[in-house]
């Protein structure tokens, strides 16, 4: 639940998307972003 835990965003930074992307990178994906509260990894 990377997108729930850190879901705060500002004009400059969206922390949940970064956390999701890092989560996906550690799993061998090219990155990812949050869609609602679900972290979607890119292949």
From Swiss-Prot:
Domain of life of the source: Eukaryota
Keywords per UniProt: Antibiotic, Antimicrobial, Defensin, Disulfide bond, Immunity, Innate immunity, Secreted
Induction: By bacterial infection.
Cystine pairs: 3-34, 20-39, 24-41
GO BP annotations, alphabetical order: defense response to Gram-negative bacterium; innate immune response
Coiled coil stretches, renumbered: none
GO cellular component, one term: extracellular region
Primary site of residence: secreted
Localisation: Secreted
A matching Pfam family: Defensin_2
Function in brief: Antibacterial peptide active against Gram-positive and Gram-negative bacteria.
Family assignment from sequence similarity: Belongs to the invertebrate defensin family. Type 1 subfamily.
Annotated protein name in UniProt: Defensin
